[in-house]
Structures are given as C-alpha cells and as structure tokens.
C-alpha cells in the first residue's frame, strides 16, 4: 500500500490567469478515508487531477512512497464525476468496467469479477448502463476505477447526486476499501458527511484552510470564524 505527499503545490491554467491552487500541502496515508471539502470553485477537482498526474503543478512536488509522481503514476487512480460519462451509450456494466483491457483473457475476467464483488454489483454485470439507478452507476464507475493496478484512489464528488440511503451504502463500500488498506481521498461539498463518515478532513479553498481529524478541523474552522467576526476581542 502507498502513501502520497504533496508539498507547496501551485497551479494556474495559464500564465495570465490567477492561481487556482496556492501553496497546497497534504499527506494521504494507507488505510485512511480522507475527505476533501470545499465550496464550488475551491479547486477540488483540479487538485485531484494534479495528484493523478493529469495536470503538472507550476510549483511544488508530489511523491508516492518517496518517489516522484511521474514514475509512480500507476499507483494513483482517479474516479471522475458521474457527469463526465454518457450513460445512454449502449454498453453493459462489465463492458464499462473492463473497457481498455484485453477482453476475455483469464486475468481480466478474474479482475472484473473481483471489482464487481467489491462494490456489490456482480449480479448487474450484464445489465446496460442506461437501465441502472444513479447509485448503481456510481458503483459501476468505482468498479472500473478499481480495475487499475493502484493503491491510492481519488474519488471526485462520488456522492453528490445520490439520495441519502444510497449515499450511505456507497460510503460503507469505500470505508471497507480503506479498512482493507487502500488510500482513499474523496472530494465532497457535504460538510456534515465529512464530519461523520471520514477519518480525516482537508478543507480547501484554493489553499488548505484546515487539515486533521473531523474534530480538529471543526475546532480550527470555529477559530477562523471567531477571528473573522472579532468575537475574541
């Protein structure tokens, strides 16, 4: 299992544009379920893409078990937001999950079955994507991500469009993955969910405002709010 460290990351989409991220430093450890929380436009999706190697930071460095990300990128897998896929495309669950792999090879079939079992949708393998509920589609997308030979998994807003019962089921699944020793980093705009379901919380708004256990982060944010309102004068 692998850990990831990002130090002093800065990123802008062009030399003329303002920085999307400024001096961002985080650490992700195996067996830990970490939430990345922040408002829309805080840079959450951009940070996940940096950590997966899709973007290159203007400054700072990212290492996986002490090695530069550029030589350890296979250790990091990103599950994009559900909206990036065309769910009306005529493909089955097993077709999506095994997409890009050698079809019908013994290893692919075994990995496919293992991924579907881990997210609890083995019985849906031959169902078309457009017949699934939102929660089932999210599980299929997670299963596809788990097909990557990685131990660090970045999930971009996986619960944003799910109803409360389905959200709870999905959180149970990713908790089990973390308990199995994987490194899970999950972006969310749901502060209540982050406080109740995660081991660690990182609050981002272009830079890291707070990081630690849910209790520690809550105290830190209360302190910031208190200072902003001059309640300690």
Predicted segments, located by residue:
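Helix-to-loop junction immediately C-terminal to a conserved catalytic motif
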Residues: 52
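Catalytic Walker B motif of ABC-type/P-loop ATPase nucleotide-binding domains
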Residues: 153-156
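Conserved ABC ATPase "signature" region
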Residues: 109-124
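H-loop/switch region of ABC-family ATPase nucleotide-binding domains
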Residues: 188-189
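H-loop (His-switch) and adjacent beta-strand-loop-beta switch element
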Residues: 200-213
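Conserved ABC ATPase signature
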Residues: 128-132
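Conserved ABC transporter NBD signature motif
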Residues: 60-73
């Amino acid at each position: 299992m692998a850990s990831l460290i990002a130090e002093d990351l800065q990123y802008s989409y062009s030399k003329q544009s303002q920085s999307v991220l400024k001096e961002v430093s985080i650490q992700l450890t195996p067996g830990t379920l970490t939430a990345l929380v922040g408002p829309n436009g805080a840079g959450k999706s951009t940070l996940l893409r940096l950590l997966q190697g899709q973007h290159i930071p203007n400054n700072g460095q990212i290492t996986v078990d002490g090695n530069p990300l550029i030589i350890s990128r296979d250790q990091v897998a990103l599950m994009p937001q559900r909206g990036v896929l065309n769910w009306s495309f005529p493909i089955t669950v097993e077709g999506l999950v095994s997409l890009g792999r050698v079809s019908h090879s013994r290893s692919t079939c075994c990995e496919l079955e293992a991924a579907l079992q881990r997210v609890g949708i083995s019985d849906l393998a031959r169902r078309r994507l457009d017949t699934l509920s939102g929660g089932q589609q999210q599980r299929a997308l997670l299963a596809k991500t788990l097909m990557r030979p990685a131990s660090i998994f970045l999930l971009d807003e996986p619960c944003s469009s799910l109803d409360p019962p389905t959200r709870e089921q999905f959180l149970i699944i990713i908790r089990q993955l973390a308990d199995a020793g994987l490194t899970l980093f999950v972006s969310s705009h749901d502060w209540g969910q982050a406080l109740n379901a995660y081991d660690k919380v990182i609050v981002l708004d272009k830079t890291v405002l707070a990081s630690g256990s849910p209790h520690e982060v809550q105290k830190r944010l209360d302190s910031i709010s208190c200072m902003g309102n001059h309640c300690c004068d």
